[in-house]
C-alpha cells in the first residue's frame, strides 16, 4: 500500500456497497455479476488497467445482501443525467427510480476511493454471462457533492476529505495526537495478546502496529475484525484524525471487553462441566496441539469422523455403550500399535451396519406382482401361486413372520430369479449369499476378533453391503454346505432361520446381538436329501420341476433369444432363429430339466452370426468415411488458396449403400450342424440300447431333474455270485439283491426253470451294471427295473424299447410309490419313450404333469411286479401260475 496521498479526480464512477463499508487501507475481494456493476468494472478498471480509480459508497438497504456478494442488484437509472444533491448524511438516488417503480437507494454521503489490485474475468456457462472478480484496496475518503447516472452506473462529483501531506506532518507533532496514538496502540496490543493463542493471523496484525503510519493505523486495525454496519459508518465519518483515533480506541476496547467477558463465562461454565464434556474439550485442545506439531492430524480427524458416523448409526443403547468403550480404547492407541487397525475396522463395521435403516415397502399390488411373475417366468403355475399367497399375507400383515421359502429343483429352472422377483414386488433390496462349498461355521457366524485377519460372517457382511436391515436375503445352494473339524454351517443356520432366535443373532466377530427378524430369507437347493432335518423343518419346501419341451420353446422365444441377441450386440435384423430350429435344438442338442444348455447353444449360434455381422460392419464404416474425408481435404486446401494435386472421380455407385441393409441371417438345419455339430441325441437311443436281452429302461431323479437310467444284466460261468458296478449306494445294492431273490423264488412261475427245485445261479455268476459309472447312484426306485432286466436275461427275451419304469418293490412283489414322478415322466418324454410304468399309488402325482405330455404318452399303473412284467414284454410275460405269494 502507498503512504503518499492519492491524487483524487473531480469525478469518480461509484460502486455501491450494500450494508458494507470499505475503509482506507483495507482490502476486500468482491464478485461482480450485476450488469451495471460489470459495466462499471469493465470501463473504469479493466480498460484503464493501473490508472483505474473508482469510488466505493455504502448503501443503506432494508434487506442485507447475501454473503457471497457485496453488490446491489440495481443502481440507478439507465437513461438521463438527472442528478442528486447532498442532503444531510445521505444522498437519495434520482427520481427516475421512483418513476420506474424501483425502491429509492440511500447512498451515504461519504465514501472511499479505491483501486484494483487484481482483476479476473470469467464467463458463466451456459448463459454466457460475463463476471468479474475484483480485489479492491481503499485509498482515501471523499465526500459526494453531486451524484448522476452515466448509462448503467452512477458517477459522483467528489471532494477530498483526508489531510494533505503537509497537514499530516504537522499533526504528527501534536501532543494530544501522540497520546491518543499511544493509548490506541496499548489497547490494540492488549487485544492482540488475548487473541494470539486463538488466531494464527494475529501475528501479522501485530506487525502493523509498528510499521503502518498512525493516520492509517486506526482504519486498517478496525477493518481487521467484525463490527456492525453502523460502527463502520461512524469510522468512515470520522474525518479528523483525533476523532478517528478516539473512535477506534473505543471500538477496540469494546471488542476486548466482550472477549474477556466471554472467556470469564467460559471458564465458569467449564468448572461445571461433566466428566465427558471436559474430556471432549481436552481432546479438542489435544487435536489443536497435534495440528500445530503436524502429528497425526489426519488420523485424529478420521477418528472424529468415525465417532460422528457411529453417533448417527442409530445403535441400541447397550450396543452404543459397547461401541463407546471400544472408541475410548482406540483413542488411547497409536496408529503404529498392532491392534489399532483391527479395532478401527471393528468400529467401522459397527458404524456401517444398518441398525435402524430400512427400505420402505411400497403398497403391494397383487395384480402387478402376478403380471411381473408371469412376464419374468413362464410356466411354474403352482410356484407362482404360492408366492402370490405369500405376498398377500405380507400385504394384510406387514409385520407377520412369514415362512422361509426354499425352492428345490434342478439347475436352470429359475429358483434365483424367483427370489429376486419377491424382492422386486416388495420394493426391498436383494442380497445373494452363496453357500455352495461352505464347510466352516465361521463363514456364517464370523471369526472371533482374536484371530489375525478375522472378519464378520457372510450374513453380517451382506447386510453391510445393502445398508438396510430388511432386505430379501437369498441363501443359495443351501444343500451344498458341508461339515468338517471347523464346524457345521447348517447348524449355524438353525439360529438364522428360527424367528424366535434370530432377533438376537450373535456374530462371533460382531460380538453383540443383531436383529435379523426383519430380513426375509429365501433358500434354494437342488435336492432335499443333503439338508439336515432340523434345518429342513424350518423351511417350507416348494419344488420346481423341470420344463417340458413346449415350455422350453416358449421360454426360448420370449426370453432367451432376445437376451442372447442383446448380449452379443445383435438384433432381429442381423439374426433370426425360427421356432422350428429352436425346437430342433431342444430335441437334438439338449436333454436337461432347465434351460441353461439351451441358452448356451443359442449363444453359440449368436456368436457365429456376430462374426459375419462384424465383418460387414467393418466394410460399412470404411464406405461411410471415404466421402466426408475427401470433401474435408478439398475444402481445407482450397480455402488456403493452395492447389490440389489430385482428381476426384465420381463413383458409379455409393459405397455406403452397398452394406446399408444386410439381409438377416436365418438359422436352418445346415447352420445348426455347422455351428453345434452333429445331433447329440435322437429318438433311436433307447431302441439301440435295448436291442438285446438283459437290458431294461428305468427312470431316476437326480439333482438336475429326471433322467433315464439303463440297467444291464449278464450271466457268466461262476459260483452263483452277484456283481454290481456303476458307483452304487447301499440302498440300490440292496434293491439288486432283493430283485435277484424275488426272481429266483418265482423262477418256475416265470417259466425260467422247469421246477422250483432248480437253482438259476448254479455254476454261473450274475453281473448287473448301471451305465454312467462316474455318476453316483442310490435309492430304492430301481427295484422294478432290476427285476425286469433279470427276467429278460433269464428268459432271453427283449424288453420293449418304448417302455420305461420306476418303482420300489418288496420281497412279496408289491410295487411301492416313489418320488419325482413329474420329472421322471418328463425325462422319458425327452428321450422319446412313449410308455411309462408307474406305481398305482403315484396316480395323484400325475396331476402335476402337463396335459400335452400326458396325452402324448401311455401311463401304465401297477400294483405288483407281475403287472410290470406283463407291460414290459411284447405279448405279456407268460406265467405258469397266476397265484400271488
Curated annotation (Swiss-Prot):
Active site positions, chain numbering: 781, 824
Domain Lon N-terminal as annotated: residue spans: 12-256
Residues that bind ATP: 409-416
UniProt feature, compositional bias: Basic and acidic residues: 94-104
Main subcellular location of this protein, as a coarse class: other
Catalytic activity entry: Hydrolysis of proteins in presence of ATP
Record-level Gene Ontology MF annotations: ATP binding; ATP hydrolysis activity; ATP-dependent peptidase activity; serine-type endopeptidase activity
InterPro entries tied to this protein: AAA+_ATPase (IPR003593), ATPase_AAA_core (IPR003959), Lon_bac/euk-typ (IPR004815), Lon_lid (IPR054594), Lon_proteolytic (IPR008269), Lon_Prtase (IPR027065), Lon_prtase_N (IPR003111), Lon_prtase_N_sf (IPR046336)
Localisation per UniProt entry: Peroxisome matrix
SMART domains documented for this protein: AAA, LON
A Gene Ontology term for the protein's cellular component: peroxisomal matrix
All residue ranges annotated as the Lon proteolytic domain in the record: 690-875
GO biological process entries: mitochondrial DNA metabolic process; protein import into peroxisome matrix; protein processing; protein quality control for misfolded or incompletely synthesized proteins; protein targeting to peroxisome; response to heat
CDD domains membership: RecA-like_Lon
Domain of life: Eukaryota
Keywords per UniProt: ATP-binding, Hydrolase, Nucleotide-binding, Peroxisome, Protease, Serine protease
Region called Disordered, residue ranges: 70-104
Described function: ATP-dependent serine protease that mediates the selective degradation of misfolded and unassembled polypeptides in the peroxisomal matrix. Necessary for type 2 peroxisome targeting signal (PTS2)-containing protein processing and facilitates peroxisome matrix protein import.
Family under the similarity heading: Belongs to the peptidase S16 family.
Protein name (Swiss-Prot/TrEMBL): Lon protease homolog 2, peroxisomal
Source organism of the structure: Zea mays
Amino acid at each position: 500500500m502507498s503512504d503518499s496521498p492519492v491524487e483524487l479526480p473531480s469525478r469518480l464512477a461509484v460502486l455501491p456497497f450494500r450494508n458494507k463499508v470499505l475503509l482506507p487501507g483495507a482490502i476486500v475481494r468482491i464478485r461482480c455479476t450485476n450488469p451495471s456493476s460489470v459495466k462499471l468494472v469493465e470501463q473504469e478498471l479493466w480498460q484503464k488497467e493501473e490508472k483505474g480509480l473508482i469510488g466505493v459508497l455504502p448503501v443503506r438497504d432494508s434487506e442485507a445482501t447475501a454473503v457471497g456478494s457485496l453488490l446491489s442488484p440495481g443502481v440507478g437509472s439507465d437513461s438521463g443525467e438527472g442528478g442528486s444533491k447532498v442532503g444531510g448524511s445521505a444522498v437519495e438516488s434520482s427520481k427516475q427510480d421512483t418513476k420506474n417503480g424501483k425502491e429509492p437507494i440511500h447512498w451515504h454521503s461519504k465514501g472511499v476511493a479505491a483501486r484494483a489490485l487484481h482483476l479476473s474475468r470469467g464467463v458463466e456457462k451456459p448463459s454466457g454471462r460475463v463476471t468479474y472478480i475484483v480485489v479492491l484496496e481503499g485509498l482515501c475518503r471523499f465526500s459526494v457533492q453531486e451524484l448522476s447516472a452515466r448509462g448503467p452506473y452512477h458517477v459522483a462529483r467528489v471532494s477530498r476529505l483526508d489531510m494533505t501531506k503537509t497537514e499530516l506532518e504537522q499533526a504528527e507533532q501534536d501532543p494530544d495526537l501522540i497520546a491518543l496514538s499511544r493509548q490506541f496502540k496499548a489497547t490494540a496490543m492488549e487485544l492482540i495478546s488475548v487473541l494470539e493463542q486463538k488466531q494464527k493471523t494475529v501475528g501479522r496484525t501485530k506487525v502493523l502496529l509498528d510499521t503502518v503510519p498512525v493516520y492509517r493505523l486506526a482504519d486498517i486495525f478496525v477493518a481487521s475484525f467484525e463490527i456492525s454496519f453502523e460502527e463502520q459508518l461512524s469510522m468512515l465519518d470520522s474525518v479528523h484524525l483525533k476523532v478517528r483515533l478516539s473512535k477506534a480506541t473505543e471500538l477496540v476496547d469494546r471488542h476486548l471487553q466482550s472477549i474477556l467477558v466471554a472467556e470469564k463465562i467460559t471458564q465458569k461454565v467449564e468448572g461445571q462441566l461433566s466428566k465427558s464434556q471436559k474430556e471432549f474439550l481436552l481432546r479438542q485442545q489435544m487435536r489443536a496441539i497435534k495440528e500445530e506439531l503436524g502429528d497425526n492430524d489426519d488420523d485424529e480427524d478420521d477418528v472424529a469422523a468415525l465417532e460422528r458416523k457411529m453417533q448417527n448409526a442409530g445403535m441400541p443403547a447397550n450396543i452404543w455403550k459397547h461401541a463407546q468403550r471400544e472408541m475410548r480404547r482406540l483413542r488411547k492407541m497409536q496408529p503404529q500399535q498392532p491392534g489399532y487397525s483391527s479395532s478401527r475396522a471393528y468400529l467401522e463395521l459397527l458404524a456401517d451396519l444398518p441398525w435402524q435403516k430400512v427400505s420402505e415397502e411400497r403398497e403391494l399390488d397383487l395384480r402387478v406382482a402376478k403380471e411381473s411373475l408371469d412376464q419374468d417366468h413362464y410356466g411354474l403355475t403352482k410356484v407362482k401361486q404360492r408366492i402370490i399367497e405369500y405376498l398377500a399375507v405380507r400385504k394384510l400383515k406387514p409385520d407377520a413372520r412369514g415362512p422361509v421359502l426354499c425352492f428345490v429343483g434342478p439347475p436352470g429352472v429359475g429358483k434365483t430369479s424367483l427370489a429376486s422377483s419377491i424382492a422386486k414386488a416388495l420394493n426391498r433390496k436383494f442380497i445373494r449369499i452363496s453357500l455352495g462349498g461352505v464347510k466352516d461355521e465361521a463363514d456364517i457366524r464370523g471369526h472371533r476378533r482374536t484371530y489375525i485377519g478375522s472378519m464378520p460372517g457372510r450374513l453380517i457382511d451382506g447386510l453391510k453391503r445393502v445398508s438396510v436391515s430388511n432386505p430379501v436375503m437369498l441363501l443359495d445352494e443351501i444343500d451344498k454346505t458341508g461339515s468338517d473339524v471347523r464346524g457345521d454351517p447348517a447348524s449355524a443356520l438353525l439360529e438364522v432361520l428360527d424367528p424366535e432366535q434370530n432377533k438376537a443373532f450373535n456374530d462371533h466377530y460382531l460380538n453383540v446381538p443383531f436383529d435379523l427378524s426383519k430380513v426375509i430369507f429365501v433358500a434354494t437347493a437342488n435336492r432335499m436329501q443333503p439338508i439336515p432335518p432340523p434345518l429342513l423343518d424350518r423351511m417350507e419346501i416348494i419344488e420346481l420341476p423341470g420344463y417340458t419341451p413346449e415350455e422350453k420353446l416358449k421360454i426360448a422365444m420370449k426370453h432367451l433369444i432376445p437376451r442372447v441377441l442383446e448380449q452379443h450386440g445383435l438384433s432381429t435384423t442381423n439374426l433370426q432363429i425360427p421356432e422350428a430350429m429352436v425346437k430342433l435344438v431342444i430335441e437334438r442338442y439338449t436333454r436337461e430339466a432347465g434351460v441353461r444348455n439351451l441358452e448356451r447353444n443359442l449363444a453359440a449360434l449368436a456368436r457365429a452370426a456376430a462374426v459375419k455381422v462384424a465383418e460387414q460392419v467393418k466394410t460399412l464404416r470404411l464406405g461411410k468415411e471415404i466421402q466426408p474425408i475427401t470433401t474435408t481435404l478439398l475444402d481445407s486446401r482450397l480455402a488456403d488458396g493452395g492447389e490440389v494435386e489430385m482428381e476426384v472421380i465420381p463413383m458409379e455407385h455409393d459405397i455406403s449403400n452397398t452394406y446399408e441393409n444386410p439381409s438377416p441371417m436365418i438359422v436352418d438345419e445346415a447352420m445348426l450342424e455347422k455351428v453345434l455339430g452333429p445331433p447329440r441325441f435322437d429318438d433311436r437311443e433307447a431302441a439301440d440300447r435295448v436291442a438285446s436281452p438283459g437290458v431294461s429302461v428305468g427312470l431316476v431323479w437326480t439333482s438336475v431333474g429326471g433322467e433315464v437310467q439303463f440297467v444291464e444284466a449278464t450271466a457268466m460261468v461262476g459260483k452263483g455270485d452277484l456283481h454290481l458296478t456303476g458307483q452304487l449306494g447301499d440302498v440300490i445294492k440292496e434293491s439288486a439283491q432283493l430283485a435277484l431273490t424275488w426272481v429266483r423264488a418265482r423262477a418256475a412261475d416265470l417259466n425260467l426253470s422247469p421246477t422250483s427245485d432248480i437253482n438259476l445261479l448254479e455254476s454261473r455268476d450274475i453281473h448287473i451294471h448301471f451305465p454312467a459309472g462316474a455318476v453316483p447312484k442310490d435309492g430304492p426306485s430301481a427295484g422294478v427295473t432290476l427285476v425286469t432286466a433279470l427276467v429278460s436275461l433269464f428268459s432271453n427275451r427283449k424288453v420293449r424299447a418304448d417302455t420305461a419304469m420306476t418303482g420300489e418293490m418288496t420281497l412279496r412283489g408289491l410295487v411301492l410309490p416313489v418320488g419325482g414322478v413329474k420329472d421322471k415322466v418328463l425325462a422319458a418324454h425327452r428321450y422319446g419313450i412313449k410308455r411309462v410304468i408307474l406305481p398305482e399309488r403315484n396316480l395323484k402325482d400325475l396331476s402335476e404333469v402337463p396335459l400335452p405330455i400326458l396325452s402324448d404318452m401311455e401311463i401304465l399303473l401297477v400294483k405288483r411286479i407281475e403287472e410290470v412284467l406283463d407291460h414290459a414284454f411284447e405279448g405279456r410275460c407268460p406265467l405258469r401260475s397266476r397265484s400271488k405269494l
